[in-house]
């Protein structure tokens, strides 16, 4: 990370990570595809109604993993073995605690949260059951994201891909078994996902327990070191809050979608799968950006940090533009993976026609946030994100309230990404100039 061609190294680092991110998304995609094809559109709508809640809570856990990634990268770049070990063992405890807390919240309040989102009464029972079962896998997700963060900071993105590939295949097979054979519908796919999450967590932990370098986990060394705890939380909590704040703002979008009929809700659920798929391909370059900048920040190489930002931004924009364009061309075929009813596919295309042009522009926001996190700045970007979400809420109560069309609801994404992207780029530029190496 601190030497060699950045164009080549960032791409080679990102490709396995991209595969890992996409496979993680495929856990939920396989849920939606199986219930859409082998259950009915009611089950599809029920699973789709939980998407933003799942995104909210998994975003918090992913944020913690991102904090671990950057802090470990800082210590590795500075060649601080003791600091690396303390960060790793502290982080494992913090992530496990976070996963348990998220699980408890989901188990206790899923029904109330889904009601606040105006989930259709006919979808409610299956949606609540799906959410509660899926929540049981949250502790495992937290542990996996911890391990992924550590390995990515070390430059190893291949092992997480292998582990998720194994868990992903098992997830799909269990989905088919529980839905087709056991007729469990939404509950079946949630159970399959929870089991797969524990398999991926177990695989990554077995590897970390067997490592021989400074990234090895020893159960006897598990404790909360104050300095490492503070550093990880200062990076992880704001990052998790960024994900959570966006998810909360998106609850207004889901509430707006839920005000339409069940066909529109199901079409939106099918099309929204493209969001997570494309975003996570782009997210691989953001993780690379934070990891490479983090190590070079620890090594004191300012020029290489700036070049990392530019290259990561370029890769992410190209990926978003290509994938968005492909989705515009092959949207109906993509949607047919998750739904069979023509009306549902038509409703999904309304979202795709707008979002396909929008994805690439989100990179200015997200890559700049990752770059700021790489230099240890995570609180101001979170405040900027909060402002962006206020904009989304205002849009919901003004533009959408005026037009009352599904298109006016979807357009808020590109406008909020543009405004936030400008602010995040400006903040990183100012912060970078103040760095002394």
Language-model segments: residues:
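Short alpha-helical transmembrane segments in multi-pass integral membrane proteins
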Residues: 1-14, 72-139, 181-237, 293-358, ...
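Transmembrane alpha-helix boundary and packing residues in multipass membrane permease domains
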Residues: 17, 21, 33, 70, ...
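Transmembrane helix-bundle signature of multi-pass secondary active exporters and lipid flippases
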Residues: 17-70, 134-141, 230-295, 316-323, ...
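Juxtamembrane/transmembrane-helix interface segments of polytopic membrane transporters
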Residues: 24, 28, 32, 36, ...
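Helix-loop interface residues and adjacent transmembrane-helix termini in multi-pass membrane transporters
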Residues: 26-29, 38-41, 75-78, 153-154, ...
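Small-residue-rich hydrophobic transmembrane alpha-helices
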Residues: 44-104, 141-160, 267-331, 362-384, ...
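Short runs within selected transmembrane alpha-helices of multi-pass transporters and secretion channels
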Residues: 65, 134-152, 160-168, 189-204, ...
